[in-house]
Amino acid sequence: MANILRKVIENDKGELRKLEKIAKKVESYADQMASLSDRDLQGKTLEFKERYQKGETLEQLLPEAFAVVREAAKRVLGLFPYRVQIMGGIVLHNGDVPEMRTGEGKTLTATMPVYLNAIAGEGVHVITVNEYLSTRDATEMGEVYSWLGLSVGINLAAKSPAEKREAYNCDITYSTNSEVGFDYLRDNMVVRQEDMVQRPLNFALVDEVDSVLIDEARTPLIVSGAVSSETNQLYIRADMFVKTLTSVDYVIDVPTKTIGLSDSGIDKAESYFNLSNLYDIENVALTHFIDNALRANYIMLLDIDYVVSEDGEILIVDQFTGRTMEGRRFSDGLHQAIEAKEGVRIQEESKTSASITYQNMFRMYKKLAGMTGTAKTEEEEFREVYNMRIIPIPTNRPIARIDHTDLLYPTLESKFRAVVEDVKTRHAKGQPILVGTVAVETSDLISRKLVEAGIPHEVLNAKNHFKEAQIIMNAGQRGAVTIATNMAGRGTDIKLGEGVRELGGLCVIGTERHESRRIDNQLRGRSGRQGDPGESQFYLSLEDDLMRRFGSDRIKAFLDRMKLDEEDTVIKSGMLGRQVESAQKRVEGNNYDTRKQVLQYDDVMREQREIIYANRRDVITANRDLGPEIKAMIKRTIDRAVDAHARSNRKDAIDAIVTFARTSLVPEESVSAKELRGLKDDQIKEKLYQRALAIYDQQLSKLRDQEAIIEFQKVLILMIVDNKWTEHIDALDQLRNAVGLRGYAQNNPVVEYQAEGFKMFQDMIGAIEFDVTRTMMKAQIHEQERERASQRATTAAPQNIQSQQSANTDDLPKVERNEACPCGSGKKFKNCHGRKSFS
C-alpha cells in the first residue's frame, strides 16, 4: 500500500514539474505583452485565429495566448494570474481537472483555457451550477473576453429559442448544466433546422465539476409531457370502434400475431371518425390507436396473455412460466388499449419524450474539463467514466487553517447543545462562524436553538441563489453567524472582514459528517482561503445517520468500555476519525457502484439515441430528395413481410402476403393470390417492390414541386420516428424496472436489459419503416397537405385526430359513384371525395 501511495505522489510531482515548465514559458512573455499598446494586445486575437487557420495547434499557441489573457486581465480587472493559476489553466486545456483550493482564483484561472479554445471558433461552454454564477462570471470575466474581441453569451432558461441561438453562436457561452442538457434534448425534437439552438458540442469547462458530474450523475434530464385525458379518450373511442367490426373488417396474420383493417374496415373507420382518408399523414396518431385496439381485442387473450387483478390492474402473463409479471406493462400503447378493452382505469402516465444523464451528456463534448477544490477522493470515477485526470495544484500561499479533531457525543441533543455553546463562545469574542449542515431540517433546528440563545444569524438553504451569494459574501465579517446546507453559497468566496484575522479567522462548524469525504472537505475549505487563518470543527453523535448505518457498534463498544455513557460525554480520538473515514469510504463505494450501474443502463439508450438523433438530424438538414431513404424502407418492409411467412404453409403464406400488400402497400384490386402463386420469395419481393415504386411515384406527382416533395418526405418520416421513439423510451423504462427484479433470480439485469433493449430497438426500426411505408402508400396527398403537416409537426404531438380533408368536391370532375376517385387514392368515388355528395 505504501508503495502505491508513494508512486501516486511521485506521479503528481512529475506532472507538476511539467506544468511548471510550461507556466514559466508563459511568464517569459509577460514583459513583451506589457509593452504592447491596448490596440496591439487586442489585435493578438485575430493573429492567433489566423495562425490557427494556417495549421498551428492550440498547444503551440498556448504560451503566448495565456500571456495575452494575463495582461488583459491586469488591464481590465486589475488581476494578474499567479503561476499556480497558469498551471491550473494548462490542466484545464488538457481536458483534466485541476484541484484548486477555495479562494485560489478558479474563475480567473478559467479565462486562459477558455480564451485559447475560443480561438478555434467552434464554441466554448462554461458550465456553472446555477444561473446566478453564470450571470456573475459572464459579466465579470466577459469584460476580459470582450476587450480581446471575443463574443460572450449567457444562456438562461427564460430566454426564447432565438435568444438561446444567439448565445450559443457566441465564441464563449455561459450556461447551467441542466439548461445545456435540456437544450440538447429539445434540439433533437424540432422538425426544422432553423429551430435548433446549439452548435456541435466542442469544449465544455465545468465549474464545481464534482457537483455536476458526480453528485448529479444519478439524476437524468427528462423532457416529458403528461398524457392528456383526451389521449385516454382516444384509447376508449378506438376500442369502441373496433368492437363494432365483424370478421370481414380486419385480417389477422396468425404466425406473426399482426392484424390490420381490410378495405371494408378502413371504410368503417373513415365513417366512424368522420375522415376522408384514414391514412393521411395527419392521422398517423389515430391509426396507432386503432392498431393497438385491434391487437387488444382480437389478438391479446384474457387469462392467456394477461389477467385482470382484483383491483382492476392489467397484469402480463409470462408465456414461459405462466406467472404474472409484476411491474411490467406492454409497450407502445398496447397496455392502455387493453385497459380500455377491459373497461378498467387507463393509467395516466407522463410520457418521456427524451432523456439523457449528465454522464452521457458531457461525454459527447469533443473536450471536457472541470474545476473544483475537492475531487481527489473521486479520482477513479473521473478517470473511468470521463477519462479525466485529477491534478492537485499547490496553493499560492501555505494553508494556515487549523482542522480540529472530531468530537463525538452520545445523542443528537447533547451534540446540538455543544454546537450552540461553541457558537455562543466564539460569537462573544466576535469571531465569524459558518455552521454547515447536511439537511434543511437540521439548519432549521440549529436556527431555532440560536434564536433561543439570543444569537443573531442568517440561514441559507440553497433556495435563493442570488440572495444567498450576498449573505455568504458577508459571512466573514466580525460577529457574523451563518447557517448553511452543504451546497448553499458554493462558488462564492468568503472574504474576512477587518480585524477578523486577529480573532482566528472564519470558524467552520460541521454538525455531522456527510456520506462523502469530498463534501466535508468542501465545508472545511470555506475557511482559510489564500493563506488566511481559520478553524474547522466537526461535531458528531452516535445517532447521526452515517454513524447509525456504519461503524457505530465498535464506537459504542469503545464507549461502554470507557463507561462514558452520560448525556454530555464527549470523546475525542484518532480511532474515531479512522472509523468515520472507513464508513465514508464504504458509502462512497456504494454510491459509485450505483452511478456506474446508471451509466451501464443509459449506455444502452445512448447508442440507440445517437442512431435515432443522427438519422433525425440528417433528415432535418437534408436539402435533397429523401426518396432513396424512403424506397429503402419500403423494400425492407416488403422483405420482412415475405420472410415472416417463409416457413408457413405455402397457400397460407401467399394469402398473408396478399393481405399485407392490400392493407399496407397497393390498391386492393391491384394484387391477387393467383398472380403470386408459383413465384419464389425473391420474385414476390421484387414484384411487390416494383408495384410499390409505381404507387410511390404516383403519390409524389400530386405535389407541385421538388420543395413540396422534400417537405412532405421530412414531415412523414419525423412524425413517425418521434412517435415510435417516445413509445420506445417508455418501453425501455418499463423494461429496466422489470429486469431489476430478475437480479433475484441470479440473472445479470444489465446483460438482460442490453439484450432485450437491442431486440426492442430492432422491432422499433421495423415499426417505423412499416408505418412510413403504409402512410406513404395509402395517404391521400394534395397540395394543402404540405402546409398542414408542416404546421402540425411543430407542435409537441399531433392533435387534429378528427380534422376533415378540406378538398372541395365542387372542384372535381363529374364522376360516377362506383368509379375510381380522381384524387388518386385508389378508392371508389363514393367512399372518398364523393362521400358527402352521396350521403
From Swiss-Prot:
Query: Which PANTHER family has this protein been placed in?
Result: CHLOROPLAST PROTEIN-TRANSPORTING ATPASE, SECA INNER MEMBRANE COMPONENT OF SEC PROTEIN SECRETION SYSTEM
Names of required cofactors:
Zn(2+)
Query: Which organism does this record belong to?
Result: Streptococcus pyogenes serotype M49 (strain NZ131)
In Gene Ontology terms, what is one molecular function of this protein?
metal ion binding
Give Gene Ontology CC terms: cell envelope Sec protein transport complex; cytosol; plasma membrane
- What are the Basic residues biased-composition ranges? 827-839
What keywords were assigned to this record? ATP-binding, Cell membrane, Cytoplasm, Membrane, Metal-binding, Nucleotide-binding, Protein transport, Translocase, Translocation, Transport, Zinc
The EC number of this protein is: 7.4.2.8
Domain of life of the native organism: Bacteria
In which residues is ATP bound? 85, 103-107, 493
Note down the stretches annotated as region Disordered: 780-839
Q: Specify the protein's topology with respect to the membrane.
A: Peripheral membrane protein
**Keyword Manganese, does the record have it?**
no
Entry function: Part of the Sec protein translocase complex. Interacts with the SecYEG preprotein conducting channel. Has a central role in coupling the hydrolysis of ATP to the transfer of proteins into and across the cell membrane, serving as an ATP-driven molecular motor driving the stepwise translocation of polypeptide chains across the membrane.
Please cite one Gene Ontology biological process associated with this protein.
intracellular protein transmembrane transport
Please give the name of this protein. Protein translocase subunit SecA
Q: Which InterPro entries match?
A: Helicase_ATP-bd, Helicase_C-like, P-loop_NTPase, SEC_C_motif, SecA, SecA_CS, SecA_DEAD, SecA_motor_DEAD
Q: Specify residue ranges for compositional bias: Polar residues.
A: 791-809
Q: How is the cofactor bound?
A: May bind 1 zinc ion per subunit.
